[in-house]
Swiss-Prot record:
One Gene Ontology term of the molecular function aspect: GTP binding
Residues annotated to bind GTP: G12, A13, G14, K15, S16, T17, S172, K173, M174, D175
Lineage: Eukaryota, Fungi, Dikarya, Basidiomycota, Agaricomycotina
InterPro entries in the cross-refs: Gpn, Gpn3, P-loop_NTPase
Keywords recorded for this protein, A-Z: GTP-binding, Hydrolase, Nucleotide-binding
Pfam families reported for this sequence: ATP_bind_1
Subunit record text: Heterodimers with GPN1 or GPN2. Binds to RNA polymerase II (RNAPII).
Record bears the keyword Hydrolase: yes
Organism: Cryptococcus neoformans var. neoformans serotype D (strain B-3501A) (Filobasidiella neoformans)
Family under the similarity heading: Belongs to the GPN-loop GTPase family.
Protein name: GPN-loop GTPase 3
Described function: Small GTPase required for proper nuclear import of RNA polymerase II and III (RNAPII and RNAPIII). May act at an RNAP assembly step prior to nuclear import.
PANTHER family: GPN-LOOP GTPASE 3, XPA-BINDING PROTEIN 1-RELATED
A GO BP annotation: mitotic sister chromatid cohesion
């Protein structure tokens, strides 16, 4: 079974940093994991991509030859990729029982305005038989501006509904969240599990009264759908990265269909059985 994780979110949310941290942790625990770059404008990586869209098409070349702007050029690059999926299939063909981390561009119009990323997710799931999921990152600094936070929740909801696959929402850069301006863990919790009713009054106090009705409509939509909550991500904490990886594994049912791997030395008579493990139940009696 093959697995693919689409790493999405707006520009500056920390997607590439998250990819690097996830790969480092996965390699530490012995997993075969590879980075796939789908950003034709990317130029720096902590890990060299195993598969790179720039080997197929480059944004700078498109902008120069077709005189497109950055966003138009990016959409053209993705359309070119989707018209040449045989290239991607050939690139992915050698990876069996592997875990692919797919770093996506930060232009959210790829899955909110035009159905490019959803088409790619469908291709991976149906044509190539990948178990596919997604993560969506927003910057923890959104918590400093409640209107911006609401916009982030809406974009996460849009991505989730557009992709049509299981998705985990992450509040990135939690290592930058300091206990200042009176912010407490309880207040941070209101953002991780958005409670629109608690936030509505604060927004209405700080915005023009003309927007109050719009704010109530947005809050009502978020509350009625109730599909977005955030897991805190601190890439400087191995425990935090491990927690995120565990949630991704659960979404894709990672490893449930894997066949036991036979040690190479078994046929040579050198195999030594590992110690037997026991399931010990602790019974606590009331005194």
């Amino acid at each position: 079974m093959r697995y693919a994780v689409l790493v999405t979110g707006p520009a500056g949310a920390g997607k590439s940093t998250f990819c690097a941290s996830l790969i480092t942790h996965a390699q530490t625990i012995g997993r075969s994991v590879h980075l796939v770059n789908l950003d034709p404008a990317a130029d720096k990586f902590e890990y060299e991509p195993t598969i790179d869209i720039r080997d197929l098409i480059n944004l700078e070349d498109v902008m120069e030859e077709l005189e497109f702007g950055p966003n138009g050029g990016l959409i053209y690059c993705f359309e070119y990729l989707l018209n040449n999926l045989d290239w991607l299939e050939d690139e992915l063909g050698a990876y069996e029982d592997d875990y692919l981390i797919i770093d996506c561009p930060g232009q959210i119009e790829l899955y909110t305005h035009v159905p490019l990323l959803p088409r790619l997710a469908t291709f991976l799931s149906t044509s190539l038989n990948f178990r596919t999921s997604a993560v969506y990152l927003i910057d923890s600094q959104f918590m400093q501006d409640k209107s911006k936070f609401f916009a982030g929740v809406m974009s996460a909801m849009s991505c989730m509904l557009s992709l049509g696959i299981s998705m985990l929402c992450l509040m990135s850069k939690m290592d930058l969240v300091k206990d200042k301006k009176g912010r407490t863990k309880r207040e941070v919790g209101r953002y991780l599990d958005p409670d629109p009713n608690l936030l509505l009054e604060d927004i209405n106090q700080g915005t023009n009264s003309k927007f109050n009705q719009l704010n109530r409509a947005v809050v009502s939509l978020i509350e009625d759908q109730n599909i977005v909550s955030f897991l805190p991500l601190d890439v400087t904490s191995e425990d935090s990265v491990n927690t995120v990886l565990s949630h991704i594994d659960n979404m894709m049912q990672y490893g449930e269909d894997e066949e036991p791997k036979v040690p190479k030395d078994m046929d040579d008579g050198e195999f030594v059985a590992p110690p037997r493990s026991y399931n010990i139940k602790l019974i606590v009696r009331d005194r």
